[in-house]
C-alpha cells in the first residue's frame, strides 16, 4: 500500500512529465491496436483468397495470368510497400500468375502497354494518373479492339483514387480499402465504363475515365501543397491568393457540341452456334442465284451541331462514371460551364470544397449533354488542363465519348446497386 501511495505522490509532484508520459502511452497503445487490426484484416483477406486458390484446375487449362502496373511513386512513395503487404499476398494465394511491371518515370506505362503481350487480366496499382496512363497506352494500340475487352482491376494506392468511389464501397481504413479491392478483382464482377478520347491538333489522343478540367479552381488546386504550413487552411489560402492575384478570373472559349447519342444494343457475350452444313450450302446457293440488289444512294443527314460562346471561371467535361446508370438509353458526357460572376468569398469557399469533391458545381452552372464536342481556345491561350488529375498544356481539343469502352472489375454489391433504378442508386 505504501508503494502505491509513493507512486501517486511521484506522479503528483512531476505532473508535467506524467502528462507527457500518459499521452505517449495512449498514442502508442492506439498505434499498436491499429497495427493489430490491420493484421487481422490482412489475415481475413488471405483466408478468403485461399478459397479461390484451392479450386482445382481442369486438365489442359492454363493458369490465369495477370499483368500488374505498379506506380511506386504513388502515395508519396508508399505504394510499393502498400501493394506488397496488402495486395500481392492475396493475388498469390488466389493462384494467379502475376507479372508486376513497375514504372520508373511518368508516361512509361503508356509505352509499356504498346508492347504488352496478351494477358487475362490487367491490374492498375496506383492512383488516377496511373489509370489514365494505362488506358491511354491500351487504347493507342493497333489491336485495341481486342485488348479493350480485357477486364481491368484497380487497386487504389494513389493520393487521389476517384475511380474507387465508383467501383468499391467507401472505406476509411487504407488496408481494408486495398484488400477489399483486391478481393473484388478475384470475384470477377465487371461494370462497363465510358471513356473520353481527347485529341489535339497534332498530338496523339489521350484517354480519360473521369474527365478534363480547365479553369481557376484547377489552377489554384495545384498550388495548395505550397501552403502546407497552414495546415487545414492551405486550400483556402491557395484560392485566396489566386483571387488576389487576378480578379475577375475569366476563361473565354467557344465550344461546338453534338447532343446525346442513342445507346446501341449490347453485343451478345456468346457467339451463336454455327449452323449445319446443309443450311450453309443453301444460303450460299440462294445468294449466288439471287439477282444483284440495286443500292439506292442515301444522302447522309447533317449532324445537328450546336455552338456556344463561353466565359467561365472553370469548364469541365466529364463522363457519367461517377454514378453510372447501366439502364440508361442515351449515352452522353456532361459539360459544366461555371459562371464567372461569382464573388471572391464564394470562390474561396467553393474552391476549398472542390479539393475533396472535384465534381461539385454551383447551382447556377450551365450543363450541356453531348456525345462529341470541340473546344476552341483563343490563340495565345496559356495555362493547363487536368485530365484525370494529370497536367497537360491547354490547347484546342476534340473530345469524343466512347460509351462502355472498358470493363472494370468492381465489388459485387456495387454492381447490384448500379443495376437498380437511378433513384434507388442515388439513395443508397
Swiss-Prot record:
PROSITE patterns reported for this sequence: DAGK (PS50146)
Membrane topology listed for this record: Peripheral membrane protein
GO molecular function ontology, one term from the record: ceramide kinase activity
One CC-aspect GO term: TIM22 mitochondrial import inner membrane insertion complex
Subcellular location per the Swiss-Prot or TrEMBL entry: Mitochondrion inner membrane; Mitochondrion intermembrane space
Enzyme class: transferase
Primary site of residence: mitochondrion
Co-factor(s): Mg(2+)
Any GO BP: ceramide biosynthetic process
Pfam annotation, one family: DAGK_cat
Reactions performed catalytically: a monoacylglycerol + ATP = a monoacyl-sn-glycero-3-phosphate + ADP + H(+); a 1,2-diacyl-sn-glycerol + ATP = a 1,2-diacyl-sn-glycero-3-phosphate + ADP + H(+); an N-acylsphing-4-enine + ATP = an N-acylsphing-4-enine 1-phosphate + ADP + H(+); 1-(9Z-octadecenoyl)-sn-glycerol + ATP = 1-(9Z-octadecenoyl)-sn-glycero-3-phosphate + ADP + H(+)
EC number: 2.7.1.107, 2.7.1.138, 2.7.1.94
Protein family according to the UniProt entry: Belongs to the AGK family.
Protein purpose: Lipid kinase that can phosphorylate both monoacylglycerol and diacylglycerol to form lysophosphatidic acid (LPA) and phosphatidic acid (PA), respectively. Phosphorylates ceramide but not sphingosine. Phosphorylates 1,2-dioleoylglycerol more rapidly than 2,3-dioleoylglycerol. Independently of its lipid kinase activity, acts as a component of the TIM22 complex. The TIM22 complex mediates the import and insertion of multi-pass transmembrane proteins into the mitochondrial inner membrane by forming a twin-pore translocase that uses the membrane potential as the external driving force.
The protein, known as: Acylglycerol kinase, mitochondrial
Source organism (scientific name): Xenopus laevis (African clawed frog)
Organism classification: Eukaryota, Metazoa, Chordata, Craniata, Vertebrata
Protein encoded by which gene: agk
Amino acid at each position: 500500500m505504501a508503494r502505491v501511495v509513493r507512486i501517486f505522490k511521484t506522479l503528483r509532484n512531476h505532473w508535467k512529465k506524467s502528462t507527457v508520459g500518459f499521452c505517449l502511452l495512449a498514442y502508442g497503445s492506439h498505434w499498436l491496436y491499429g497495427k493489430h487490426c490491420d493484421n487481422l484484416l490482412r489475415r481475413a483477406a488471405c483466408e478468403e483468397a485461399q478459397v479461390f486458390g484451392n479450386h482445382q484446375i481442369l486438365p489442359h487449362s492454363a493458369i490465369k495470368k495477370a499483368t500488374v502496373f505498379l506506380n511506386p511513386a504513388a502515395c508519396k512513395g508508399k505504394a510499393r510497400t502498400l501493394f506488397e503487404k496488402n495486395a500481392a499476398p492475396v493475388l498469390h494465394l488466389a493462384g494467379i500468375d502475376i507479372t508486376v511491371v513497375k514504372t520508373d518515370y511518368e508516361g512509361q506505362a503508356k509505352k509499356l502497354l504498346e508492347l504488352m503481350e496478351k494477358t487475362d487480366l490487367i491490374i492498375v496499382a496506383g492512383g488516377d494518373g496511373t489509370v489514365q496512363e494505362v488506358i491511354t497506352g491500351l487504347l493507342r494500340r493497333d489491336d485495341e479492339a481486342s485488348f479493350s475487352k480485357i477486364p481491368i482491376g484497380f487497386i487504389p494506392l494513389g493520393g487521389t483514387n476517384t475511380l474507387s468511389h465508383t467501383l468499391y464501397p467507401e472505406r476509411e481504413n487504407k488496408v481494408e480499402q486495398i484488400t477489399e479491392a483486391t478481393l473484388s478483382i478475384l470475384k470477377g464482377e465487371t461494370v462497363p465504363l465510358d471513356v473520353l478520347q481527347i485529341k489535339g491538333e497534332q498530338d496523339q489522343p489521350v484517354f480519360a475515365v473521369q474527365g478534363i478540367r480547365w479553369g481557376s479552381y484547377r489552377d489554384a488546386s495545384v498550388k495548395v501543397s505550397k501552403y502546407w504550413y497552414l495546415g487545414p487552411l492551405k486550400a483556402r489560402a491557395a484560392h485566396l491568393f489566386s483571387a488576389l492575384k487576378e480578379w475577375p478570373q475569366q476563361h473565354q472559349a467557344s465550344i461546338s457540341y453534338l447532343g446525346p447519342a442513342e445507346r446501341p444494343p449490347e453485343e451478345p457475350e456468346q457467339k451463336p452456334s454455327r449452323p449445319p452444313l446443309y443450311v450453309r450450302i443453301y444460303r450460299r446457293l440462294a445468294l449466288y442465284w439471287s439477282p444483284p440488289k440495286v443500292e439506292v444512294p442515301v444522302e447522309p443527314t447533317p449532324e445537328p451541331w450546336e455552338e456556344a460562346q463561353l466565359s467561365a471561371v472553370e469548364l469541365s467535361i466529364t463522363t457519367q462514371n461517377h454514378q453510372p446508370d447501366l439502364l440508361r438509353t442515351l449515352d452522353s458526357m456532361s459539360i459544366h460551364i461555371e459562371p464567372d460572376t461569382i464573388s471572391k468569398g464564394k470562390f474561396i469557399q467553393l474552391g476549398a470544397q472542390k479539393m475533396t469533391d472535384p465534381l461539385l458545381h454551383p447551382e447556377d452552372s450551365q450543363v450541356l449533354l453531348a456525345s462529341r464536342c470541340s473546344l476552341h481556345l483563343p490563340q495565345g491561350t496559356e495555362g493547363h488542363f487536368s485530365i484525370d488529375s494529370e497536367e497537360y498544356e491547354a490547347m484546342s481539343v476534340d473530345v469524343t465519348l466512347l460509351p462502355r469502352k472498358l470493363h472494370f472489375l468492381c465489388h459485387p454489391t456495387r454492381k447490384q446497386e448500379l443495376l437498380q433504378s437511378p433513384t434507388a442508386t442515388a439513395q443508397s
